[in-house]
């Protein structure tokens, strides 16, 4: 099977890049022929790809000459709102190649409202029609399937989560009595991630031995807003702003923490939760994320991201013993082994592609 993935960029920090890159890597390992088309294949900090994955520019794809030498079975488009992705969709339709479209959480109500005036125009010009024309819409959670249905899409949908590699269990010793509870956030430093609520929760935790480490790139100048608020509240010493980390450096961050937080106002999936659980670290996620299973499997907390509720929950967590946290982490690792490996994700995506081809859906 020859599969063409189309995505604006493959920057390491983006969840869309992780999914596209790891699915591509997994597919070529399974013997599939995979090409990824991006706006700029020479951009810095691209997600690492298997050498068998061909990386090209989108502009080079949208030509008749390219198609005559590359007879793709499926075009898999990642993300929304870009005229470039619209052109790729139109190109696939003109050449009768079925499209699988991953919405990657961008149809979430919060996301649809954010900069709505720009999206309103794009929605009615091309995006709604493009999604209706997709052979299959790919969602990573049941919640995302629901979002897409509420927007009126009756296309077949497949639910395939983001995956994770099962990591070696941390060799770092557990927190000793009297040591600070080390709480890690990994992701973009951006308003939707809910970090301002964490800073304000810290104001209610001044009598708790707790340290927050924030790992990820600043976006839209939000980091300076968080730092200023932490200083205003007198909690600056409770925060480490570490900037982006990748590869081994990021693995060390997970190893050193006691738990992960995902306090977002909206989250299609939240791959960092899986990354933490795979390392036997429990996680706290907001009820705006699809992580109720943390409570169901007793490997974390699923709570409101209001500062008061966060503070209340952190006080309870800080009172837990190292053994109790370790037991939660081990249950989380077992959950990942059952449900969230990249091998399982890639197998599910192949089944999705095959369903398109076997039923002649265009």
Predicted regions: what is each one?
Residues 17-22, 181, 185-204, 224-225:
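A conserved mid-protein helix/loop that constitutes part of the nucleotide-sugar donor-binding site
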Residues 36-43, 186, 211-227, 243-244:
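Glycosyltransferase donor-sugar binding loop
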Residues 94, 119-136:
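Membrane-proximal helix-turn-helix segments that form the acceptor-binding/catalytic region
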Residues 130-156, 164-166:
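A short, active-site helix/loop in glycosyltransferases that binds the activated sugar's phosphate group
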Residues 244-245, 252-257:
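Short alpha-helical donor nucleotide-sugar binding micro-motif in glycosyltransferases
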Residues 265:
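Aromatic "clamp/platform" in nucleotide-sugar-dependent glycosyltransferases that forms part
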Residues 282-286:
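Short hydrophobic beta-strand element within catalytic cores of glycosyltransferases
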Residues 301-308, 316-322:
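Conserved acidic donor-binding segment of nucleotide-sugar-dependent glycosyltransferases
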